[in-house]
């Protein structure tokens, strides 16, 4: 049981440290066991990788790697946001093309949002518009929150092909077809999938939001790794959202969006009104109830305490606050500009007991009852809650194929963030999953291999965690010391001496007992030398004591020390001498009354010398 308890403690310590690593992103574990990253074998350092700009292997609508080092084809917005001050309404956020801060792949660059707390907007035209018909839509790109993220987004907008789209005027209200990507503020982590659906009768566009993903998104915002975001929308009205090529959300456009695509068949009649005689009161005051005669509604809730007395030393004429006598007028004070200077007020030190007009404290009025109200009873005329009648929805429609959205012709990023250095790379829009997968293999997977090759070992990770949390050093020491202590206690067990209860007197106590008995006998015999009967009677108690002690000592365990054995031998000899002396004295007493002194005295002398 002892080893089981220690093992349990070790397990709890390991779980605690491991959970701490997970929270800090020191070593983030994949949320799926079938991770593609787990299949990537250990590679050498990033300096041995040969990067080649990804090339699409099939038909695409848009690709961008930023490896050229310039923003050719991209247009910075010059628009201003509506309903905002001109100073903060402009899109003046800065964009740069840079390599990753960590785990760089030589030659691989990306688009980086550089400004903090500014509006950013940039867009590029597709090679050809995407028309929703009979081909899937696949949108894929990479994001790395290099400095983490406090509040901001990294989503993209697929701008609607309206015919009058001007990218320099791109702003938050520009018409889009799909908005997709990560967004975070506070502790709210989101992965947006929003599309604008056109009402076939009214022509009004309405935003439809896909249900939230089924996984915890926090690690993708905090681990400072490059993650791959993929959206797949199929002509059969199904969709999938993937992170790092693993599905995190899926469903249908008809059933898994809010609000629903199709409106209700019936709606409340807007012209229907509740009848005046409709009684929807579930409870009413009891009409038969009468206010009691002694009910006084005029009594106040609180009254002055008539038993209160003004404390002695209360100063009625003293103010509670006085000007600070130590305050001085500032040198730069101008009476013309600042007005007449007045010293700040402080509590009056003379008002320790109280100052000003004294008033007795207020107490609850025992006679107070308040306004009388009759008790409530069930309404006999209750008709229930009224609701308007239903009528057919004049705007009802049934869209069985919501995949047929408005075509789009440009991709844009319209973002605001409190954290800079958000990295974007390897955009692709296509219709074939194989094309997108190969694009990810040539770009994103290479970043992952470099990151894995540069990943610190277990010991280094433990040191990094302890540098951020010094208390982990103590846990490491405990975890390292416990196995050593267990091995030591198992291999070199401590010798436990068996303790016996000391039932007999010690050697010194035995000697004292014998000496005391002998002295008492000697004193009594000197007082009455002519009475051998008394000597015999007095000798018996001493003999009994010696015999008793002897029995107790003999009853001890055999594991006695040498000293104990010597004590036993001495006790036996003393007992024998005592017995022989007693017998001799008895015989001498029978022969002559005066002959018992010499043997007794010699016996005492011999016993004392023996001790």
Swiss-Prot record:
Residues 317-350 are annotated as: Interaction with PPIB. Residues 265-284, 526-584 have a biased composition (Basic and acidic residues). Disruption phenotype: Male mice show normal mating behavior and produce morphologically normal sperm, but are nearly sterile. Mutant sperm fail to adhere to the egg zona pellucida and are generally unable to penetrate the egg extracellular matrix. In addition, mutant sperm display defects in migration from the uterus into the oviduct. The chain crosses the membrane at residues 472-492. The modification Phosphoserine is found at residues 561, 578, 580, 582, 592, 595, 602. Residues 1-19 form the signal peptide. Keywords: Acetylation, Calcium, Chaperone, Developmental protein, Differentiation, Disulfide bond, Endoplasmic reticulum, Meiosis, Membrane, Phosphoprotein, Repeat, Signal, Spermatogenesis, Transmembrane, Transmembrane helix. Disulfide bonds join 151-185, 351-355. Residues 493-611 are cytoplasmic. One of its GO terms (molecular function) is protein folding chaperone. Pfam families: Calreticulin. PROSITE patterns: CALRETICULIN_1, CALRETICULIN_2. Belongs to the calreticulin family. This is Calmegin. It comes from Mus musculus (Mouse). The lineage of its organism: Eukaryota, Metazoa, Chordata, Craniata, Vertebrata.
């Amino acid at each position: 049981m002892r080893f089981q308890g220690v093992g349990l403690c070790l397990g709890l310590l390991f779980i605690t440290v491991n959970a701490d690593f997970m929270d800090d992103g020191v070593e983030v574990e994949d949320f799926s066991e079938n991770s593609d990253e787990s299949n990537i074998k250990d590679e050498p350092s990033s300096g041995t990788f040969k990067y080649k700009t990804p090339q699409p292997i099939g038909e695409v609508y848009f690709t961008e790697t930023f490896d050229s080092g310039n923003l050719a084809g991209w247009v910075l917005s010059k628009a201003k946001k509506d309903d905002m001050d001109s100073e903060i309404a402009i899109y003046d956020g800065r964009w740069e093309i840079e390599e990753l801060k960590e785990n760089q792949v030589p030659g691989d660059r990306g688009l980086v949002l550089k400004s903090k707390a500014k509006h950013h907007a940039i867009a590029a035209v597709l090679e050809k518009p995407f028309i929703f018909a009979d081909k899937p839509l696949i949108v894929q790109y990479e994001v790395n929150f290099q400095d983490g993220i406090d509040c901001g987004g990294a989503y993209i907008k697929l701008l609607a092909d309206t015919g009058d789209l001007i990218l320099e005027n791109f702003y938050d209200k520009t018409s889009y077809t799909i908005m997709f990507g990560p967004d975070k503020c506070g502790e709210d982590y989101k992965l947006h999938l929003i599309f604008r659906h056109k009402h076939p009768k009214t022509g009004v566009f309405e935003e439809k939001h896909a249900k939230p993903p089924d996984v915890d998104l926090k690690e993708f915002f905090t681990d400072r790794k490059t993650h791959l975001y993929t959206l797949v929308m199929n002509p059969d009205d199904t969709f999938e959202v993937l992170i790092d090529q693993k599905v995190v959300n899926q469903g249908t456009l008809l059933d898994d969006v809010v609000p629903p695509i199709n409106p209700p068949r019936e709606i409340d009649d807007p012209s229907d009104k509740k009848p005046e005689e409709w009684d929807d009161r579930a409870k009413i005051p009891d009409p038969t109830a009468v206010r009691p005669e002694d009910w006084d509604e005029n009594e106040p809730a609180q009254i002055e305490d008539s038993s209160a007395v003004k404390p002695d030393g209360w100063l009625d004429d003293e103010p509670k606050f006085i000007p600070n006598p130590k305050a001085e007028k500032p040198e730069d004070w101008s009476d013309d500009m600042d007005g007449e200077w007045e010293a700040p007020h402080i509590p009056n030190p003379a008002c320790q007991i109280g100052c000003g007009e004294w008033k007795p404290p207020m107490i609850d009025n025992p006679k107070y009852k308040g306004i009388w109200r009759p008790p409530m009873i069930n309404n006999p005329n209750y008709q229930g809650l009224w609701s308007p009648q239903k009528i057919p929805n004049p705007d009802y429609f049934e869209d069985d194929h919501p995949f047929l959205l408005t075509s789009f012709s440009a991709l844009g990023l319209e973002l605001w963030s409190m954290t800079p250095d958000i990295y974007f790379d390897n955009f692709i829009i296509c219709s074939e999953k194989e094309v997108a997968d190969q694009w990810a293999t040539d770009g994103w997977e290479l970043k992952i291999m470099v990151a894995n090759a540069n990943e610190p070992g277990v010991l280094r990770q433990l040191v990094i965690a302890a540098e951020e949390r010094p208390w982990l050093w103590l846990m490491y020491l405990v975890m390292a010391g416990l196995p050593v202590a267990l091995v030591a206690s198992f291999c070199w067990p401590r010798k436990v001496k068996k303790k016996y209860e000391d039932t007999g007197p010690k050697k010194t106590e035995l000697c004292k007992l014998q000496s005391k008995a002998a002295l008492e006998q000697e004193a009594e015999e000197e007082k009455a030398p002519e009475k051998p009967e008394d000597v015999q009677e007095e000798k018996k108690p001493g003999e009994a004591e010696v015999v008793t002690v002897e029995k107790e000592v003999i009853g001890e365990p055999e594991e006695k020390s040498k000293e104990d054995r010597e004590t036993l031998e001495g006790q036996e000899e003393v007992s024998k001498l005592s017995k022989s002396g007693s017998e001799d004295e008895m015989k001498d007493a029978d022969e002559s009354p005066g002959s018992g002194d010499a043997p007794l005295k010699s016996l005492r002398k011999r016993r004392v010398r023996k001790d």
